[in-house]
A protein has these predicted regions:
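Charged, low-complexity intrinsically disordered segments
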Residues: 1-189
Length: 189
C-alpha cells in the first residue's frame, strides 16, 4: 500500500500539517493552529507572557520562529515531553474538526509520512530516513478516532435502552487517550 506523504497545508492531506488553519482549543485557550499550541507549550511554564506572544503570532511559521528564539529559554524538560504535547494537540485538532477527522479516517491503514525536507525528527528529512514522529502520532490518533467511531456506532445501534445507557457511560477511546497523555505530562513536571 502506497504511503501518504503530506507537508504543506494546501496540498492533499493538508489537514495532517500542523500549519493547517484549523484552530485548536486546549487547556481552555484557543490557538490559530496546532503549531501555535505546540510552540506555546515550550514556554508557558517558564515565561507565560512570552508564551502568549507565541500564541498570538499571525502565522504558524512566526510562532515557530518566536518559540525557537534562543533569547527566550524553553522549559527544561521539553525533550522529555514534546512527543506527548504533540499527541495532545493532534488529538484535539482531529476531535474538534470533523473535516480533518473524516480525512484522516479515510486514509485507512496507509502509512502517513510528513515529507519535510528539513526535519528528520518530526518528518522523514531530506534523505527520507527520518523518524517521522508526526506521522507516527497521526497514525496513533487515527486508531483512537477509529475506536471512537466504532463505539459511537455501537451506541447508535443499541436496541435496548439499558444496553445503550451502559455503552454511553463508557469513556470514549479519545477521552481515555487524552487522560493517559495528560497523566504522563503531569508526572514529567
Amino acid at each position: 500500500m502506497e504511503p501518504i506523504r503530506f507537508y504543506r497545508p494546501q496540498d492533499p492531506h493538508g489537514c495532517c500539517s500542523n500549519y493547517s488553519l484549523h484552530a485548536v482549543t486546549a487547556d481552555g485557550v484557543t490557538f490559530l493552529t496546532s503549531e501555535h499550541y505546540y510552540q506555546w507549550a515550550k514556554h508557558i511554564t517558564v515565561d507565560p507572557a512570552y508564551a502568549e506572544t507565541i500564541r498570538l503570532a499571525p502565522t504558524p511559521g512566526k510562532a515557530w520562529r518566536l518559540a525557537n528564539d534562543r533569547a527566550h529559554p524553553q522549559r527544561t524538560d521539553w525533550e522529555q515531553i514534546k512527543d506527548d504535547v504533540m499527541r495532545l494537540v493532534v488529538l484535539h485538532k482531529f476531535v474538534q474538526h470533523e473535516d480533518c477527522r473524516r480525512e484522516i479516517l479515510a486514509t485507512g491503514d496507509r502509512m502517513l509520512i510528513e515529507a519535510s525536507p528539513r526535519d528528520a525528527y518530526w518528518g522523514e528529512g531530506a534523505d527520507r530516513t527520518g523518524r517521522n514522529m508526526l506521522g507516527m502520532i497521526l497514525m496513533e490518533v487515527r486508531g483512537v478516532l477509529r475506536e471512537d467511531a466504532a463505539l459511537q456506532e455501537q451506541i447508535d445501534g443499541a436496541s435496548s435502552g439499558m444496553h445503550e445507557d451502559a455503552l454511553a457511560n463508557l469513556p470514549s477511546p479519545a477521552a481515555e487517550y487524552e487522560r493517559q497523555v495528560r497523566a504522563r505530562l503531569a508526572t514529567a513536571k
